């Protein structure tokens, strides 16, 4: 199964440095919407997922690069 098939709303999202990034609020195809801990809402691609375990999604992004990624997509 693909990692995105294990994601559901309410899952917590973390960076590869184990910093909390936000919470999944919805899934649209190969993307999921996330409410960030910094107040920024964003869409992330499922291909950027590192692992999904026990309602915990770990992204390949560091917390700094994710913020830059979200801002560049606005």
Regions found by a protein language model. Give the residues of each.
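Peripheral interaction segments used for macromolecular assembly
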Residues: 1-74
């Amino acid at each position: 199964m693909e990692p995105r098939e294990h994601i559901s709303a309410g899952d917590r999202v973390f960076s590869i440095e184990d910093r909390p990034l936000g919470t999944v609020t919805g899934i649209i195809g190969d993307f999921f919407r996330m409410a960030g801990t910094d107040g920024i809402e964003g869409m992330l691609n499922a291909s950027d997922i590192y692992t999904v375990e026990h309602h915990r999604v770990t992204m390949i992004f560091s917390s700094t690069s994710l913020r830059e990624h979200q801002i560049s997509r606005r």
